[in-house]
Structures are given as structure tokens and as C-alpha cells.
From Swiss-Prot:
Top EC class for this record: hydrolase
Keyword flag Protease: no
Protein's name according to its UniProt entry: Elongation factor 4
Family of this protein: Belongs to the TRAFAC class translation factor GTPase superfamily. Classic translation factor GTPase family. LepA subfamily.
Chain's gene name: lepA
Organism the protein comes from: Campylobacter hominis (strain ATCC BAA-381 / DSM 21671 / CCUG 45161 / LMG 19568 / NCTC 13146 / CH001A)
GO cellular component, one term: plasma membrane
Length: 596
């Protein structure tokens, strides 16, 4: 058992994490050469297309050194800030982590965030400089950055190129020498944590577990502490990205997949503890946090009869991604749909794309919002994540909104642009540090609502793509906020309501009605688009009526005849205006997102 090493790879996006995982897999011959593909750990199409890792994957590698066989359990983690929950979950199951930093780009914001998670779990961290084959690689500068920003000693940092294979053997040997073997307790009652679960069409719900104490065998009867249910172990496997390898038992310190033949993944929820039903452990494994949704949006099917299909699709996705939450909601404008909670904007995009792609649905997503705390005059406190749920202003004593702590690393030449952007988003500066003469670390406290829309795009365009950004929720602070409603043809469109700071409401209202005017199709009657706060209209635009030339068939003749026809048309339009309905195209709901 002292020959086992459990480790993760942590890095910022695009620093070569998945390529390094590929290289380790091929070096240890875990996947046959003919089955090897680039990004072999990234199994979803979206992951390969976008070049990002979304779902943490595991693989068991075997390596011989000094005539001893070692088992290396590699857990590949996502780099993007939205998926940091996947990272912390993976790191909780390891004893060590490889910190990959691009030797040309240096330390980035998400590198810092993920390293701190590893330090919290007391992991042995091995710094690795990747892409040293690039002509602009500067390993010494990057080592200094790691020491200055993160405070990890880089004298033994390993220089590799995942692309060409330089330094990979040194890295594997360093993993074996420097990462401690797991503490094992084979004689104690079984205690294993479920740190991932997903759904397989043939085998049902699968649980990826890390065994801390004892052993689990095929045909054992296990007891899941969270659900208090008993199940028989039908099969045990070691993880491999191509096809898992079957085994009879998984011992203390090892990682493996348990097949219990369950139809529902909620029966094997992530973070739960598995033990034997006839020899139970006393306490579950603690210190495991559930993912908390951070951003909420309404998701509606464009064809209203597809509501049940959407429910099934969300149920199936939740099997693979326990961090989404959803509840049914109705909207006057969009019909039946769900209010879905996500970990961040990229997560929202990915989930929406997976729903459309894997389940053949056409969906509309409303503007994302956060959870607000509403303190009422009668002493009650409500939490809302849909602006249309906001009570009347007269009943509200104060509104608190969530803040996030943002870390940004940028080249010094773009500092002015960034500070302007952060100030316009109501950011409060807490730290500014020159890492080197031309790179700056900024830390800001900023309302979460200001960063979930298009902040990332603006940050990238203002710094020509060089700045990196990371955020974590901190706490709630009081804000001067009000609800802005949009009326089309005199009717409130609930899906377009947003909560905004009072001093930005007027400008936001004007921008919104202007954008809507371009999108709402012209009708046979004039359509008014208005922005209102309570009963007060603050901005208005009109979509002009389409004119039908009713006098076309009057040749010459009497002007009174023409006038009569025009009057009749006017009457008809008036009547139409009072009872007419306007169908809004789905772009209208997206236009809200685009407004700065």
C-alpha cells in the first residue's frame, strides 16, 4: 500500500493541464497507443471544442521504478473559476498536487485560487513549469513569480514540455518521491467518500470513491450514511478514460468506481460516506462542502409543449453535475420553465449548450441574477433570486446584495483601463501589488451582480486578452437597489425585469427600451415600449405601426371618400391597440444581457 500516490493537477486555463495528463497516461501505458487521442481525459465534446476541462476525471496509472511497482491515481481537475468546486472536491481525495504554470505566461489569477485550495487541504505541492520548449519561455522569471505571489519554494521545480515529452520521467519520479503515500487503516471498518457520481446508460448510477479505512469487496452489502439505505455492490472498477478496469476489491488508500445498480444518482450524492451494513463506521467523513449555486437564470423551452422534456433533461444532467439546482417557475411572457442555479456564467453557458445538444431542445435563457436578501418592514427576511418576486417598495426596509472578492493579474500598461472598468462596476479596491515591474496584482470587493453579466468579456477586451481574473463570494452588503420593469404595449414583461442600483436606473432604462425598439417586430398598431420603476415611467420608445395603403383603390375622386377610409383604418387600429398582443422574439430576452 505504501506504493500508492494520489495526486491532482492544478493550473490556470490553457497552461497545458490536459496535455500533461495525456503525456503521463501514455508514459505509463494506461491507454493503448491506438486509442490515445489528445485531451483523452476530456470526454465531452464541449470540453474538446472549447479546450477546457469541465468534469474532473480520474485514471489509475502503473509505473515501475527501481524494480518496484507504483500505483499513481491521477485526478484531472478543471481550471476555470466556475468549476473550482470540482477542484476542491478532487483535492480533498489526494495527498499531493502538481502545480502547472506556463513558463511563458507566468502565474495567473486562477493558479492562485486553486493553489490556496490545495494549501487548505495540506497537500504536498510540486511546482512544474510547462511549455519550456517555447522560444519565449522564461523559467527563472516564472519561478520568482511563484515564490513571490504564492510563497512556494521553487528550487526543486521541474521543467517539462508536455507537448514534446521533455522532463516527464523526472516528474513521475518526483511524484513518487515527494508525494506521501496515503495513510491506511485496512483493519478498521470500511469508510469511503463519494467524490463524484455520474450516470451510465447500462450500469445506472456510478460512484467514484476514495477508500480511507478498510476494504470494499464485490457482493458486499454497503450502507450509505446520508440516505441511510443499503445496497449490494454489483461491480468494482478502477477508473480509466477509455474503459474502466474491473477488480474484486478496492483497499484503503485507493480510488475506484462502485456499481450499485441504482437508477437515481441522488442515492449516491457527492460527499456522502459509504460503510458496510454489518460493520458500520461510527461517523461519516467530514469537511466536505456542497456546491452552492451562485448565479440563477430562467430557462424556458421555445416550444412550450417541451416542458416535460426539459425536466427530464435537467434530471439527467443533475446525475452528472450535482452542483445544478432547479425549480419550476412560470412567466407570463415565456410560459412554463425552470429557475436554474449555476456556479457561474461559463457553467450556465455549458449547461444550456449541453441541454440543447444532448437532448435536442431549443431554449431561451433569461438574464442571470444573484440571490438578494430582502429585509421587510415587518421584520421578516426573504431571499429571492428572481427580480419579479421582489415585494412592493413600500414594504421593503433594505436590500442586501452579495459581494465577491476579485483577484486580477494584468500587465501594467492596462492598469488604467482596468481601474476605470472596476470603478464603473462599483468595485472597492482592497490591494494593489506590483509583482514585477510590468505585472500588477489587483484585489477588489465588487457586487457579484456586476461581474456575472459581461464583465469577463470587458476585462479581456480592455487588456487585449492578457489579464486573468478569479472571484470568490464573500458576504452580503446593503445596496441602494430598485426593480426596473419593462412594459410592452402596456403589459409588464416579467422575464425582462432586473434589479439595478438606483443611480444607474435611468440610463439602464433608456438603453433597454432603445435596444428593445430594434427587436420588437412592427405591428399593425403602434407599440409603446416603456421602462418603469414602480408606477413611474422613466423611459419610452415607440415602434411605429405598419401602414396599409387603404386609399390605393380610390382613383382621383372625392377627398371625403379617402378621408372616410382613413378614419375607418384609424378606428380599427385604436381597437387593435387596446386588445392587440405582441409576440416577443427570443432575441428580446438576450438583448437585456448585452446592455452595458
Amino acid at each position: 500500500m505504501e506504493n500508492i500516490r494520489n495526486f491532482s493537477i492544478i493550473a490556470h486555463i490553457d497552461h497545458g493541464k490536459s496535455t500533461l495528463a495525456d503525456r503521463l497516461i501514455s508514459e505509463c501505458n494506461a491507454v493503448e497507443d491506438r486509442q490515445m487521442s489528445s485531451q483523452v481525459m476530456d470526454t465531452m465534446d464541449i470540453e474538446r471544442e472549447r479546450g477546457i476541462t469541465i468534469k474532473a476525471q480520474s485514471v489509475r496509472l502503473e509505473y515501475k521504478m527501481n524494480d518496484k511497482k507504483y500505483i499513481l491515481n491521477l485526478i484531472d481537475t478543471p481550471g476555470h473559476v466556475d468549476f473550482s468546486y470540482e477542484v476542491s472536491r478532487s483535492l480533498a481525495s489526494c495527498e499531493g498536487a502538481i502545480l502547472v504554470v506556463d513558463a511563458s505566461q507566468g502565474v495567473q489569477a486562477q493558479t492562485i485560487a486553486n493553489v490556496y485550495i490545495a494549501i487548505e487541504h495540506n497537500l504536498e505541492i510540486i511546482p512544474v513549469l510547462n511549455k519550456i520548449d517555447l522560444p519565449n519561455a522564461d523559467p527563472d522569471r516564472v519561478k520568482n513569480e511563484i515564490e513571490h505571489i504564492i510563497g512556494i519554494d521553487c528550487t526543486d521545480a521541474i521543467e517539462v514540455s508536455a507537448k514534446t515529452g521533455i522532463g516527464i520521467k523526472d516528474l513521475i519520479e518526483a511524484i513518487i518521491k515527494r508525494i506521501p503515500a496515503p495513510k491506511i487503516e485496512p483493519k478498521k471498518p470500511l469508510k469511503a467518500i463519494i467524490y463524484d457520481s455520474w450516470f451510465d446508460n447500462y450500469l445506472g448510477a456510478l460512484a467514484l470513491i476514495r477508500v480511507y479505512d478498510g476494504e470494499i469487496h464485490k457482493n458486499d452489502e454497503v450502507f450509505i450514511m446520508g440516505t441511510e439505505k443499503k445496497h449490494i455492490v454489483l461491480d468494482l472498477m478502477y477508473p480509466n478514460p477509455i474503459s474502466p478496469i474491473k477488480t474484486e476489491k478496492i483497499s484503503s488508500g485507493e480510488i475506484g468506481i462502485v456499481v450499485l445498480g441504482l437508477k437515481n444518482v441522488s442515492d449516491v450524492s457527492v460527499g456522502d460516506t459509504i460503510t458496510l451494513s454489518n460493520n458500520k463506521a461510527n461517523t461519516p467523513i467530514g469537511g466536505f462542502e456542497r456546491a452552492k449555486p451562485f448565479v440563477f437564470a430562467g430557462i424556458y423551452p421555445i416550444e412550450t409543449d417541451k416542458f416535460e422534456d426539459l425536466r427530464d433533461a435537467l434530471n439527467k444532467l443533475k446525475l452528472n453535475d450535482s452542483s445544478i439546482s432547479y425549480e419550476p417557475e412560470t412567466s407570463l411572457a415565456l410560459g412554463f420553465g425552470f429557475r436554474v442555479g449555476f456556479l457561474g456564467l461559463l457553467h450556465m453557458e455549458v449547461i444550456k449548450e449541453r441541454l440543447e445538444r444532448e437532448f435536442n431542445l431549443n431554449l431561451i435563457a433569461t438574464a442571470p441574477t444573484v440571490t438578494y436578501e430582502i429585509y421587510l418592514t415587518n421584520g421578516e427576511m426573504l431571499k429571492i433570486h428572481n427580480p419579479s418576486e421582489l415585494p412592493p417598495i413600500s414594504n421593503i426596509q433594505m436590500i442586501k446584495e452579495p459581494y465577491s472578492h476579485a483577484t486580477i493579474i494584468t500587465p501594467a500598461e492596462f492598469l488604467g483601463n482596468l481601474i476605470t472598468l472596476l470603478n464603473s462596476r462599483r468595485g472597492i479596491q482592497t490591494k494593489m501589488d506590483y509583482i514585477t515591474s510590468d505585472r500588477v496584482l489587483l484585489e477588489y470587493d465588487i457586487p457579484t451582480n456586476e461581474i456575472i453579466m459581461d464583465f469577463y468579456d470587458k476585462l479581456k477586451s480592455g487588456t487585449k486578452g492578457y489579464a486573468s481574473f478569479d472571484y470568490e463570494p464573500i458576504d452580503y452588503k446593503q445596496g441602494d437597489l430598485i426593480k426596473l420593469d419593462i412594459k410592452v404595449a402596456g403589459e409588464n414583461v416579467d422575464a425582462l425585469s432586473i434589479i439595478v442600483p438606483r443611480d444607474k436606473a435611468l440610463q439602464k432604462g433608456r438603453d433597454l427600451v432603445k435596444a428593445m425598439k430594434e427587436i420588437v417586430p412592427r405591428q399593425l398598431f403602434e407599440v409603446a415600449i416603456q421602462a418603469s420603476i414602480g408606477n413611474k415611467i422613466i423611459a419610452r420608445e415607440n415602434v411605429r405601426a405598419m401602414g396599409k395603403n387603404v386609399t390605393a383603390k380610390c382613383y382621383g375622386g372625392d377627398i371625403t371618400r379617402k378621408r372616410k377610409l382613413l378614419e375607418k383604418q384609424k378606428e380599427g387600429k385604436k381597437r387593435m391597440k387596446s386588445i392587440g398582443k405582441v409576440n416577443l422574439p427570443s432575441e428580446a430576452f438576450l438583448s437585456v444581457l448585452k446592455i452595458d
